[in-house]
Amino acid sequence: MDNLRGEEAVHAKLFSGQQSVTFLLSILLLGLSQPTWAVDVNGFTFSGDVRTGWVQYDFNNPDGDPDINKGHKDSQGWYIVPKVSLLTPSYNNFSGKITLAGATDFGLNDPDKESRNFVFDPVENKSFAILQELYIEWQTEQHQALIGRKEYVTPMIDADDWYMLANSFAMGVYDNRHFNNTSLKAGYFAEMAGVWDSGANGTEFHSMSDASFVPQARKDEADDKGVYFAAVDYNNDVHHAQVWNYYADELYNTLFAQYDFIRGNDNFNYDIGAQFIDFSEVGKLKSSDTEIDYSIYSLRYDAGWGNGISIATGAAKYTDGGGANETLGAWGGYPYFANGMIYHFFEAGSLQNAASYKLQVGYDFKRQSPDKLGIYLRHTRYDLDPKYSHSSDGEGQDLLTMTGLQVKYKFLRGGYFTGTYEQHHIDDEPTTWALRLIGGFTF
């Protein structure tokens, strides 16, 4: 009877959101009914992205009870996120870009049901606008330098543009491409904005130390420090090897290394990858009572066939050291080989000494449609160590599983849509699920 009531509750909550979902899809289809493209005026390029989405997270916890699923409260909402950019022409190899962005719900959402949506700041919980990008770039065939605010992509500090609004960073970087197939990078991240991945108010730019996931006392000790980084990336389309090092001053160092062997043709292709990530405390944090000292070893095998079928597999082992809750997902980095589609790892008590496994199957309808349509089914399993991972009421946890279904669709000129549903089971907590319907158009 309890299971039956649970299923009825799920369907009731889904039904309660149907009007909002219908509104979302109506706006999306209206926007996509006309193909759009960037506008060029005397070398100045105007472009943009209008994104809209319905997100819903059911933790079986409508009142935010701290003894259920870490106190995470059921949340849902509809949002629209416009973004517009102006890129200058190149003058003596110099160019610049400015991007304005924002997010609003037009007052349609229930503020009491938005705490886990992470589109608005969870404390202020209101619409916002932001100067997302403003940078100057110098680029030649072998050199590139950039300073300013930019949606920048690296493995462990990333724009992470898979949700409603990407992360952006106040930064500087130099990239040398003198050697064939090789990129040598060095730079500094000073600040970050991004609601989903920031440990501070993500609707504004904050120092990298404030935007980290370490305890507030460690942030205060770091005193608005940034992150230095350097990288070597070699890629000849068969062998792709990369090593990145990130030094978060007074907090912790992150070493990321990955190798992929990639082969294939129109009938069959595959990617065999190995990854190593190490987190180690430095500076003032090293002398504090916060521990960050662990590594992750991972393998993957991904393959695709000419008939549209694909598989993606991964396995990861977390060593027996502390700090996973203070580092995983910080600053937008999600390069991990064995994650879920939505939930990833935040609902586990701890991933210390854990192991994870992923199996995904997909189908690309490229032979049936001129548009790009794909459907993917993923199952992720975490074997937890009950010595470290505990439920909200203190019980040890052995197992966390996630099963997700995702549909991706790109159509017309710039239209896109991603729908994702994932169910989440963990020992000694109620079953949870999440739904994301996100789409829009670029121009």
Predicted feature locations:
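Cleavable N-terminal export/targeting peptides
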Residues: 1-42
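Residues that define the transmembrane beta-barrel architecture of outer-membrane proteins
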Residues: 76-80, 128-132, 165-170, 224-228, ...
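Extracellular loop and loop/strand-boundary signature of outer-membrane beta-barrel proteins
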Residues: 66-72, 119-122, 157-160, 215-218, ...
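Outer-membrane beta-barrel translocator/channel fold
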Residues: 182-227, 268-348, 352, 421-435
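Transmembrane beta-strand segments that form the barrel wall of outer-membrane beta-barrel proteins
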Residues: 52-54, 145-159, 184-186, 230, ...
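C-terminal structural cap/anchor segments
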Residues: 315-392, 401-402
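Beta-barrel outer-membrane channel/assembly domains of diderm bacteria
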Residues: 27-152, 172-178, 182, 264-266, ...
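Sequence/structural signature of outer-membrane beta-barrel proteins
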Residues: 53-62, 103-109, 150-160, 191-195, ...
